[in-house]
Amino acid sequence: IPEEFLELLPDSPRDEDLPPRQLPAWAEAKVIANPAHGDRVLDDLCTLFAALRMDMLEQLPRMSGIQTSYWQLLLILSKSLDLLDEHQQPKENARVFLGKPRSEALRWLAQSWANSHAFDELRMAPSLRCEGTWQHDTIAPRRKILEWLNALPNLTWFKVEDFVDDVFRQQADFLRSGADYNTWIISTSDASARLLHGFEHWRDVEGQYIRFLIAQVLVYLGMVRTGKLLNQSEDLVFQVLPEFSGLLSPDGSLELPEEDQSVLVGRDGKLEMTPLVPRIARYQLARFAEWRTLQADRYVFQLTPASLQAAGE
């Protein structure tokens, strides 16, 4: 890990940069928790790479039941981490990634994202539209939010808006500062295309950046879990998972099951796989078969004369 990245790790926070952590906590009994994403991103990236190779990207939302925005985020993440070439085809780096043990692969993914210049959460936030040629440092604001989240106790529920308010009070300029508030051309992505100039739109810009980072990126990487409060469904809550430090710390530990299961091959040519079939095997076999089922715990493919002929062309 590059030395400049070590600042965000659990054993070396800079106390003078950390705002006080006095957020109101919510009891487990008051929260309706969403399922944790866990390490599913590893399996979904395998699916994405196979779909790109077979020109099936547009079919993924329908086949998987997962919204298009999720697959687009994984696509952008893959490009940012140099896993895809200029034609959106998996590179050798992607094959190496698929061959890594699950714990090693997820740690590599989280650490590479955290130190990526190319991945830009601000330009990806769905409610924002960034225009113009202005540039900004993508790593510094991300690192700040990660540092502050790391200062929170694990497995404790907090409102996302309380965290946003705390950042606003303690270090509002973590993303924009000075003239940036007026020179960065940012508007809402809805039909109104409302310009968000000035510090008065901090919660519309910085707030949305934080919400997107917590509720989507960190959830998908298996580092944060979200939920809703009972009788207050409009209030999104989150908890930092133990995997947060396990993924980002060079000394962290992360135990994930080995991919040691076999492909079930039916007499009719049906191939069934669980997530514990080696990802590299599923990636390779998916090319030779028709895709039938994409579920979190089960993948089904069918070998047919047509699929075998197409794979050979």
Segment roles from a protein language model:
Residues 1, 79-89, 219-230:
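A short, conserved structural fragment
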Residues 33-40, 101-313:
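Extended alpha-helical interface modules used as scaffolds for assembling large macromolecular complexes
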Residues 71-80, 313:
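Extended, highly charged accessory segments
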